[in-house]
């Protein structure tokens, strides 16, 4: 038992991603009928999702010019949907349904990555003026954001009431959250705005555009049925 605790403490990211994968697989198993897939395929999808998610956050960090060991959670926000689009086309599944089911899995994966930030001491908030050694709890605030989002979205996804809107709602909310919280995050810049503010705005715009398109499509389909 002691050896297990030591290994977990030495490799927190691997342990957290393993936990995230297990939770993701459980969710996919519960909703696999929505994806019309077998139980073993749901397991493979959960594992593949984590691996692709890790590659996404590392690739985006590389694009931003960070070092090889860095991660940027915007990578998951921007790159993972491309995987959903590809998977939906290859396996001939409705894209909205695929995105709805996998959005909580993505959120859990990013949550695990942010917990790793706390354990590894990176991505800290700015020092709070007048309070010696205490920083703004930006990472902890992000974890609360994820939890609230999951609490609000998962029941609706479970009941099939999101209609493909789970992902755009997530990226809109995340864009707003990150834009605000970045003012309190410690960055290697003296300017008020920095790169993450830009990506937050991009995230918000993507979410709005997708949400609007889904709403337009629904209205068009309803008009067609009423004729």
Feature roles, as predicted:
Residues 1-227:
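Hydrophobic, membrane-interfacing alpha helices
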């Amino acid at each position: 038992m002691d050896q297990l605790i030591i290994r977990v403490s030495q490799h927190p990211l691997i342990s957290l991603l393993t936990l995230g994968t297990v939770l993701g697989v459980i969710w996919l198993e519960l909703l696999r009928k929505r994806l019309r897939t077998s139980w073993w395929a749901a397991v493979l999808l959960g594992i593949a999702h984590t691996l692709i998610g890790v590659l996404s956050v590392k690739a985006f960090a590389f694009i931003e010019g960070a070092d090889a060991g860095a991660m940027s959670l915007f990578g998951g926000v921007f790159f993972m949907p491309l995987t959903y689009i590809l998977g939906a086309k290859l396996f001939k599944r409705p894209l909205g349904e695929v995105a709805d089911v996998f959005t909580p899995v993505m959120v859990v994966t990013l949550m695990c990555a942010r917990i790793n930030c706390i354990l590894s001491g990176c991505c800290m908030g700015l020092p709070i003026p007048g309070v010696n050694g205490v920083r703004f709890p930006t990472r902890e605030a992000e974890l609360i954001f994820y939890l609230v989002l999951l609490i609000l979205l998962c029941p609706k996804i479970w009941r099939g009431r999101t209609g493909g809107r789970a992902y755009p709602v997530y990226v809109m909310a995340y864009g707003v959250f990150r834009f605000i919280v970045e003012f309190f995050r410690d960055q290697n810049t003296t300017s008020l705005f920095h790169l993450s503010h830009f990506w937050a705005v991009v995230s918000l715009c993507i979410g709005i555009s997708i949400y609007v398109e889904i709403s337009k499509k629904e209205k068009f389909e309803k008009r067609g049925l009423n004729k």
